[in-house]
Design a protein with these regions (language model features):
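Membrane-embedded, hydrophobic transmembrane alpha-helices
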Residues: 1-91, 425
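Hydrophobic alpha-helical membrane-interfacial segments at the cytosolic entry of transmembrane helices
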Residues: 94-103, 215-219, 304, 336-362, ...
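Transmembrane alpha-helix segments characteristic
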Residues: 102, 297-308, 323, 344-350, ...
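Active-site lumenal/periplasmic loops and adjacent helix-entry segments of GT-C-fold
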Residues: 102-279, 314
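Hydrophobic/aromatic-rich transmembrane helices and adjacent perimembrane loops
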Residues: 189-192, 273, 318-321, 441-460
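Membrane-interface alpha helices of multi-pass inner-membrane proteins
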Residues: 264-267, 286, 299-314
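Hydrophobic, aromatic-rich transmembrane alpha-helices
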Residues: 282-290, 323-334, 399-420, 460
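Perimembrane helix-loop-helix junctions
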Residues: 287-297, 302, 306, 319-351
Length: 460
């Protein structure tokens, strides 16, 4: 276990140096979560690169560490240091905002991931289906050494179209000798810090307000829906929140309440979502500064950060593409100039080449081979196969999202132009997700819809 902790610390240290180099004016409140995003990205990229040639084996893992150390040494040689960071008088507000949610998350990770009680492993409702799958993938990749992996559940006869880098970031620690629970949890800790910290930093940067950043943070992670109304009728109904199965104010299928809490129903059970957002939220923060604040020098750092995103979380990669497309239109609308367009071309070329190499033999191949992955469907889980809706379109989102949904139009009208453009990227995501399904289960389009919701919480 100690060796695994040291290995993770190496990648996180390089991630912090990368964040410091990318954003030299950043305070520790920016560098720490941004550095966690860079560190996890490197942990996904480097072992996979060597595993393509050597298999997912100890030599590949060792060479990845050497490469990470080399990157860190290069940054140090160029004068990058973690000391002397900018002072931020608002950093205390960040940590005060994050601390309660971080403590809740740590407790839930402890109780939901292979929690041994009286000789039996315990978990929670949200992890019943997802965690066994993830544990199987993590163990299989480490034990077989096969890379690119194939689905172990199907006897190795089908290509692995699932974004498997969210598993290799734990498989690497199994290869290093860690037990399965330790390997499962280790990379999740910096990933959560990146998600929480960079959500807050993005919200503050976009709104230029500490108070609005804190409000957006809790509106998103704690929820603003109206599902609680269904549990106010009697004491038994209210008690059912704690004792029933799929009877919570954010997950009550019987009443078409399915806008789940992102912490307990997305980030903890669904590793692809966690590690995808761990990279996506820092990326959107850099995109805001790159596109809407004119910091064109950031494009190589943005490209480096998101290199593994399609195989960490394909939905997050698609969401980022749409945000970049709208950002590119914004740049063109300001008057195209060579010095503003070249960085966009560089970003598109690097990400386009790297992402296609990853996706052609995996995600795209599975989407196009007749497995009903890509099809038309309207209104997410509210839409039925016969074309009808379970609830009125707007009422469905009003009762599921609540206050934030009701405030979107007035907030958009009062927003500054750059904020409207950023949210325009969210509207592009919403429009696509409401008409096209990208996987066999309609429900999983929420992985796109929640990115729209992130921007909606910041806007509102």
């Amino acid at each position: 276990m100690l060796f695994s902790v040291f290995y993770l610390s190496l990648f996180l240290s390089v991630g912090l140096l990368s964040a410091r180099r990318a954003v030299p004016d950043g305070s520790a409140a920016v560098i720490v979560p941004l550095g966690c995003g860079f560190g996890v990205s490197l942990l996904a990229v480097l072992p996979a690169l060597f595993a393509v040639v050597l298999g997912f084996t100890p030599p590949a893992v060792a060479l990845a560490a050497v490469a990470a150390a080399g990157i860190g040494a290069s940054l140090l040689y160029r004068g990058t240091r973690l000391r002397g960071m900018a002072k931020d008088p608002d950093s205390g507000a960040l940590w005060a905002c994050l601390l309660p949610v971080v403590l809740i998350t740590l407790y839930l990770l402890h109780t939901h991931v292979l929690h041994l009680v009286d000789g039996a492993y315990h978990t929670g409702q949200s992890c019943y289906g997802d965690m066994p799958m993830h544990l199987g993938f993590i163990k299989y990749i480490a034990q077989s050494g096969e890379f690119l992996p194939r689905y172990p559940l199907l006897g190795g006869t089908h290509r692995f179209g699932y974004p498997f880098l969210c598993e290799t970031v734990s498989s690497v620690f199994v290869v290093l000798g860690a037990d399965l629970r330790t390997a499962y949890l280790l990379p999740m800790l910096p990933a959560f810090l990146s998600v929480y910290g960079m959500f807050w930093q993005l919200a503050r940067r976009v709104t230029d307000s500490v108070g609005k950043a804190c409000l957006a943070f809790y509106l998103f992670f704690m929820g603003s829906g109206l599902g609680f109304v269904y549990f106010l009728g009697s004491a038994d109904s209210f008690a059912g929140i704690f004792t029933g199965f799929y009877t919570t104010p954010t997950n009550f299928v019987e009443k078409n309440i399915e806008w789940v809490n992102p912490i307990v129903d997305l980030l903890i059970p669904q590793r692809a979502t966690l590690f995808g957002w761990c990279v996506l939220l820092p990326a959107v923060y850099l995109l805001w500064r790159f596109c809407y604040e004119g910091e064109r020098r950031l494009w190589p750092w943005l490209a480096a950060l998101v290199l593994p995103l399609p195989l960490l979380h394909t939905h997050s990669a698609l969401a980022l593409v749409l945000l970049c497309l709208v950002g590119g239109v914004y740049t063109l609308a300001q008057g195209p100039r060579r010095k503003t367009l070249l960085p966009w071309l560089g970003l598109a070329a690097v990400c386009g080449a790297a992402w296609l190499c990853q996706m052609l033999p995996t995600v795209l191949a599975q989407s196009l081979d007749g497995q009903h992955m890509l099809r038309l469907h309207f209104n997410w889980i509210n839409g039925q196969d016969d074309g009808t809706l379970r609830d009125n379109y707007f009422w469905f989102y009003i009762k599921n999202i609540g206050l934030v949904y009701l405030l979107l139009i007035p907030a958009f009208l009062r927003a500054k132009p750059k904020q409207r453009w950023l949210y325009g990227g969210g509207l592009a995501i919403l429009a696509l997700a409401e008409f096209v399904v990208f996987q066999p289960n309609n429900y999983d389009n929420n992985k796109l819809l929640y990115v729209w919701h992130i921007l909606g919480c910041i806007l509102a």
